[in-house]
Amino acid sequence: MKKGKIKALLVLLVIVLAGIYYYVTIPAINIHSTGIWIFILFVLVLILAAYAAKKKFTSIREVKSSKFLKIGGIVLMAVLLVFAAGSILSSPIVNAKQYRNLLTIEERDFSEDIQPVNFSQIPLLDKDSAMILGNRKMGSMVDMVSQFEVSDLYSQINYQEKPVRVTPLVYASPIKWLTNQSQGIPAYIMIDMTTQDTSLVKLDKPIRYSEAEYLNRNIYRHLRFHYPTYIFDQLSFEIDDNGTPYWVCPVRKYTIGLFGGATIGRVVLCNAQTGECQDYTLKDCPEWVDRANPADLLIQQYNYYGTLVHGYINSIFGQKGCLKSTDGYNYMAMEDDVWVYTGVTSVSGDQSNVGFVLINQR
């Protein structure tokens, strides 16, 4: 085979493999995304491997004498060094004060600030209990149970001033996806957290964009192709005041170095039925959205606040004055929003609560 054809085939192979890697991993094209750095390293290794295959080196001496491989190796090491330096300089080790200030905390008096809650607004079920009810409801739907299952999402939201959990159906298997994906997902589950009433809400238009899809209608891939530079946090399945299903997609903003100080700067709302996307700042987000800030991120930010009170070294060794959230958290419906609440304890692990924290997910 002619050298020109071999070169063209190798170039095509590199492009195809890089394209497949990008399509599968869908990293954000953003300097703050660790995924894009890994993608760059992958492409560099592919290029060097293709060049070595074209040249058909027969000895280590030939490899060492190749100017192209030397330059490629230097570029590869430079990318690795920048990535490593960025990771260290973005960490709490050198930015303890900035990490502690990620979340604004107000100390309040419980008896003065917290009013008695209407019992009709107190969730009586946790997520595990809701999952049991959801699976039981799905099992009774003889026309769907062989083709669909219930997703494990179970997002807690406020719907018409009631705390409910909502979760979409998913295809029962890849084969069931293949036979049903043209029609989409026909319903979602809604559970009233105060009365335990469980309903399967059938939709006039099916859900076509979800985590259960495998190709372009996969919600993560759909978002990436619409917003190639956005770094998305944990997605949440919610419904608006009319019961229309949406994906609430928080967009991360990094405020400390390359990879540190993650907060939420924007929210993308994706209609799960049509795939239509709308981009909002946090303050302009529609009122029905309850989970603009993921609970795990808020808890992490509180733990930075509690443990870094006297710097990073103290948080590891002396631990003077260090507090952290207790294991697990739950949700409370208050002021027509969903609040994350968790206990606060010392890092010594004495299992005693010294208070609790309420964080608005808006």
Q: Can you say where each PLM-predicted feature lies in the sequence?
A:
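Soluble extracytoplasmic regions of secretory-pathway and membrane proteins
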Residues: 3-362
